[in-house]
């Protein structure tokens, strides 16, 4: 009799990706941060009603906040709770990580941008944030050329 393996290595289920961030920024470091959410926000995220393409991270009073992350409230949301779709949401990071981010952003001109949002262990929403600098126009053109060349290479290899 074969037993099912209950301890599978569960892949994190991606909720949203910020493709624009990977095109606009070159990331030096990436961090995983928890997200402080209300009940209606979790329900909306489970329904897939989230957009992080315009969002960014701000540091204020030693804490990190995710701004302009648009979570559309469901129609069946509670009537006694005011649903603000773009409210700033607190990111849950260690003090050491917050201090490192603050130092690099203030001194060296780095930006903190969310890269993706995913489920961890089925119930926790995590945000992958990247610490990086903006790309110049020629860097973006190089990325486009490289991507086109990779597609062309794959096409040629497939036909052989």
UniProtKB/Swiss-Prot annotation:
GO biological process terms on file: trans-translation
Keyword Cytoplasm: yes
Residues making up the signal peptide according to the UniProt record: none
A single GO molecular function term of this UniProt record: RNA binding
Keyword Cytoplasm carried by entry: yes
Keywords: Cytoplasm, RNA-binding
InterPro entries: SmpB (IPR023620), SsrA-bd_prot (IPR000037), SsrA-bd_prot_CS (IPR020081)
GO cellular component: cytosol
PROSITE patterns documented for this protein: SSRP
Principal location class: cytoplasm
Protein location: Cytoplasm
Family to which the UniProt record says this protein belongs: Belongs to the SmpB family.
Function: Required for rescue of stalled ribosomes mediated by trans-translation. Binds to transfer-messenger RNA (tmRNA), required for stable association of tmRNA with ribosomes. tmRNA and SmpB together mimic tRNA shape, replacing the anticodon stem-loop with SmpB. tmRNA is encoded by the ssrA gene; the 2 termini fold to resemble tRNA(Ala) and it encodes a 'tag peptide', a short internal open reading frame. During trans-translation Ala-aminoacylated tmRNA acts like a tRNA, entering the A-site of stalled ribosomes, displacing the stalled mRNA.
Protein name (database record): SsrA-binding protein
Native source species: Shewanella amazonensis (strain ATCC BAA-1098 / SB2B)
Chain's gene name: smpB
């Amino acid at each position: 009799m074969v037993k099912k393996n209950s301890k599978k290595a569960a892949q994190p289920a991606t909720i949203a990706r910020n493709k624009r961030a990977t095109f606009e920024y070159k990331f030096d470091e990436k961090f995983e941060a928890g997200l402080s959410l209300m009940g209606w926000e979790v329900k909306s995220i489970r329904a897939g009603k989230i957009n992080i393409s315009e969002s960014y991270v701000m540091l204020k009073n030693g804490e990190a906040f995710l701004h302009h992350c648009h979570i559309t409230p469901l129609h069946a949301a509670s009537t006694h709770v005011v649903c603000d779709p773009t409210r700033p949401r607190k990111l849950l990071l260690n003090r050491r990580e917050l201090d490192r981010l603050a130092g690099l952003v203030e001194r060296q001109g780095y930006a903190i941008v969310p890269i993706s949002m995913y489920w961890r262990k089925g119930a926790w929403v995590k945000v992958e944030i990247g610490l990086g600098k903006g790309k110049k126009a020629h860097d973006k053109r190089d990325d486009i050329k490289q991507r086109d060349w990779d597609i062309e290479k794959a096409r040629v290899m497939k036909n052989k």
